[in-house]
Swiss-Prot record:
EC number(s) recorded for this UniProt protein: 4.6.1.16
Name the UniProt record assigns to this protein: tRNA-splicing endonuclease
Family to which this protein belongs: Belongs to the tRNA-intron endonuclease family. Archaeal long subfamily.
Pfam families in UniProt: tRNA_int_endo (PF01974)
Natural source organism: Picrophilus torridus (strain ATCC 700027 / DSM 9790 / JCM 10055 / NBRC 100828 / KAW 2/3)
Amino acid sequence: MDYIIEDGFHFDIKNGKSPSYLINKYRTGHVIGNVYLLNKYEAFYLYLKNKISIDDEFFNGNIKFYMAYENLIGSGLYVKILNDCFMCRKSRNSRYKKVRFMPDDILLSFKDLYSDDSNIYITVDEEYESVYYSMERIDIKGSRKDDFSAASIDVSSGAYFGMNCPEWFGIDFHGKRLLNDYEIRFLNNDVKSNVDVIYKDLIKRGFIVKSGFKYGSNFRIYKNSMNEHSDYLVNYMDHDLWYVIARAVRLASNVRKRLIISGIIDNDPVYIKIERIKDIKTIL
């Protein structure tokens, strides 16, 4: 039997072991006719474990992609590589699920992320630690039914104050409700950006919507009352680097909140939730 890496390199199996031993124990490679075939990441994994010997400098892959692969294999999963993704399952009898590898510097559009058929991601950070994320398209709903029909704006000394607004709208300023730019544009029905569209839609969906500036987000939202804990931070996304998204998820987690990313698809506001996962097996 020939032992071949997909790039054409030949290797030997150490200690008299057979291909079936490596396939069963390490879940690597497959036999085609009279050839035991490995991809370069499987070969590098076995090489580092001192299970195969190769004379040539054969590995020319992405080291972070390899480290993601090694982490998945080390978690006891069955792993196949498909382009820039891993197909993973917990056992021989379970179904494969796609786990997409996300380089830190990949630029994504919201539409790309929203329409992605993967809902599990793995990235390797600058300290070479593997981190998992889940993505879910969600239809978020609050429980407020606020009435703005009688609301108006009073301009005094260059400041804008809300009149006849819900108690949460604006901030208290000597007994008046001082408005921010989003609130002013909302009452004036003046939409200047997609972020304004998201702001208006969140209120329509029954949320209290407040600034998320101190959390590095566009908004923080409450389902019913500001006396409750704000569960979600909301960011608007058009295009972003993956590391910016991952950082926002981490910051939300650090303040015991979850991150919702919003965007516009076919002129409609839509939402996805992205969270860090400690154990990938819980969602496979």
